[in-house]
């Protein structure tokens, strides 16, 4: 199984939207479910295009052959928070525990360092122990929690706030 990590390009838009529907249906750890993201292929391609040559944002895809099996992004925050980037990641369930999350995160951290980010922020479900372990392995620290970050079927879901100080 050869996994490639690549920057997303506009021609990935349709496959990325399908991937997001897939992973949204595999876990309750994401901000969306099996409906995926509410964007057209054209809108997604435009969004990817806006990130393509940016030093403020990046979207990476993990691919096995031509299939998207993971996605990670880092978006620089505005104005007085511009030293920080907000991080998001997902990996298809069939590819969990194969090092893909680590590969994506390594590449995101390298991009952040190269482009003068000082802090990477993320939020993670408190019961997502695998993800928390991945982040801690890469140097992230817990800095707080939110007792009702998600609400799924009338149940409040607790999240941890974590950050990685780069400078």
What would you call each of these model-derived segments?
Residues 10, 24, 34-93, 105-106, ...:
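Acetyl-CoA-dependent GNAT
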Residues 105, 128-131, 148-153:
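Short glycine/proline-centered loop/turn elements that form peptide/ligand docking sites
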Residues 4-18:
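A short beta-loop-alpha structural element at the N-terminal edge
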Residues 121-124, 136, 141-157:
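Conserved catalytic-core motifs of GNAT/GCN5-like acyltransferases
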Residues 89-94, 98, 126-127:
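Active-site acidic-Proline motif in GNAT/NAT acetyltransferases
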Residues 156-167:
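Terminal substrate-recognition subdomain of acyl/acetyltransferases
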Residues 97-110, 114, 133-137:
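Conserved acetyl-CoA-binding loop-helix of GNAT-fold acetyltransferases
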Residues 112-123:
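Conserved GNAT acetyl-CoA-binding A-motif
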């Amino acid at each position: 199984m050869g996994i490639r990590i690549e920057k997303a390009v506009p021609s990935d838009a349709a496959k990325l939207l399908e991937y997001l529907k897939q992973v949204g249906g595999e876990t309750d750890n994401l901000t969306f479910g099996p409906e995926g993201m509410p964007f057209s292929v054209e809108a997604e391609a435009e969004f990817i295009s806006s990130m393509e040559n940016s030093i403020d944002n990046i979207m990476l895809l993990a691919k096995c052959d031509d299939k998207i099996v993971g996605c990670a992004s880092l978006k620089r925050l505005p104005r007085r928070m511009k030293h920080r980037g907000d991080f998001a990641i997902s990996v298809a369930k069939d590819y969990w525990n194969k090092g893909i999350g680590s590969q994506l995160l390594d590449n995101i951290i390298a991009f952040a360092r190269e482009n003068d980010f000082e802090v990477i922020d993320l939020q993670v479900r408190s019961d997502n122990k695998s993800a928390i372990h991945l982040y801690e392995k890469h140097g992230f620290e817990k800095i707080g929690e939110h007792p009702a970050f998600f609400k799924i079927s009338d149940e409040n879901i607790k999240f941890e706030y974590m950050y990685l100080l780069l400078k």
